[in-house]
């Protein structure tokens, strides 16, 4: 275990994973803030508890926040799995740093541009992150 913790590739992976986990927590918080700000709830008990409006449809601002959150849930856990396998498979420190930091920065930028409705930047950031995971997956298969 000590050997793994002292491995530079693992340290990079762990740092990036922690940053992405915090980012996911902040995205969930952002969704909650938007729900509270608009006082719109799809659960009647929440509407009652927070003196808000109950409805079957999400408020557009909340729906946008939920799409950002869902996008994270579709992409970041894949990084957690593939990145860990890649590091455990013996990735070099430099290759691990390149893939992990590229993915992490792409996801942080994706978050910013998604919050601000900026296309084509959102698609570009998504694609950069996608290629990072794909690159690690291919390296795992080839090793």
Tell me what each language-model feature is.
Residues 82-93, 141:
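Juxtamembrane "helix exit" motif at the C-terminal ends of alpha-helical transmembrane segments
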Residues 70-85:
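Core segments of transmembrane alpha-helices
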Residues 22-38, 108-111:
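Transmembrane alpha-helical segments that form the membrane-embedded catalytic/substrate-channel core
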Residues 106-131:
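Interfacial loop-to-transmembrane junctions
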Residues 29-67:
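Cytosolic, membrane-interface loops and tails of multi-pass inner-membrane proteins
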Residues 93-102:
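Structural signature of hydrophobic alpha-helical transmembrane segments
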Residues 1-30:
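Long, highly hydrophobic alpha-helical transmembrane signal-anchor segments
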């Amino acid at each position: 275990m000590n050997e793994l913790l002292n491995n530079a590739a693992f340290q990079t992976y762990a740092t990036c994973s922690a940053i992405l986990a915090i980012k996911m927590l902040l995205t969930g918080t952002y969704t909650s803030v938007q729900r509270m700000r608009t006082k719109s709830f799809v659960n009647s008990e929440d509407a009652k508890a927070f003196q808000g409006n109950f409805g079957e449809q999400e408020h557009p601002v909340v729906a946008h926040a939920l799409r950002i959150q869902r996008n994270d849930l579709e992409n970041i856990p894949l990084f957690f799995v593939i990145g860990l396998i890649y590091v455990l498979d013996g990735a070099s420190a430099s290759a691990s740093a390149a893939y992990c930091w590229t993915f992490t920065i792409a996801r942080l930028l994706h978050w910013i541009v998604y919050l601000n409705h900026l296309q084509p930047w959102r698609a570009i950031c998504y694609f950069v992150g996608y290629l990072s995971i794909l690159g690690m997956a291919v390296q795992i298969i080839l090793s």
